[in-house]
Amino acid sequence: RLREQAARDSGTPERAAGLLQGCDAAMRDLYSPLWSSLPAQGPLVIGHIGQSLDGFIATDAGESRFVTGRDNILHMHRMRALCDAVIVGAGTVAADDPQLTTREVPGPNPLRVVLDPRRRLSAQHRVFRDGEAGTLLVQGQGASAADIEGVESLRLTDGEGLDLRALLHALHARGCRRVFVEGGGRTVSAFLEAGLLHRLQVTIAPLLIGSGRPSIRVRGSVSLADCLRARHRVFRMGSDVLFDLDLAERGDGAKPGTDLTGMDRIL
């Protein structure tokens, strides 16, 4: 596995050049931090969320495919191909049954990491049985369900939820230098609250859902001066708009890896 990882890491810009054929200069620039901004310690962690104008990722009935358009779907597949691991929560797997592969673009599949603290997912979901890529099931120490045959399992302390820092350390130890946190809202929010994201991509679709499953939710600010502000870039994704936030130098003075709230765990 580590030898395979080294092969992925060597020549990343060259691999990206083939993957990004047909993309304009602006889109190519969106992906440049994946090889130009690797931290000295630990993996580069990039979060992504696709939402409506009014901040929802799904309807009240749970319908979420697809809030954003085709261009953003291709973008997520490129991100998977350029990263070593893709992380999703159990809610995303239960609602969407995603494959988390790179079937829409030329490029390697990442390690699929599913966070399921209480082991409520069945073995019937595609990430556990399709054999398209490796899957790591992350669950709490207290989860009582049996492991899933053919799926690697990692148990983490779960006094108040999964220890996300320990997860990133484990992924880095196995050679994952780029980690893509793809969803859903609770999972991305947990990484953001803990100060574990280096970048955050928010793709906004031109539609209003009205009510439903919320997008990012973080601790509220008493005043605008206390809000998290970050340098950002804006990219067109067809009819959608993607905001790429650089959290390496946050407006609140914190840097990735700084625990702002103690909430570096996910329920």
Could you tell me what each predicted segment is?
Residues 1-267:
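Enzymes that bind and transform nitrogen-containing heteroaromatic metabolites
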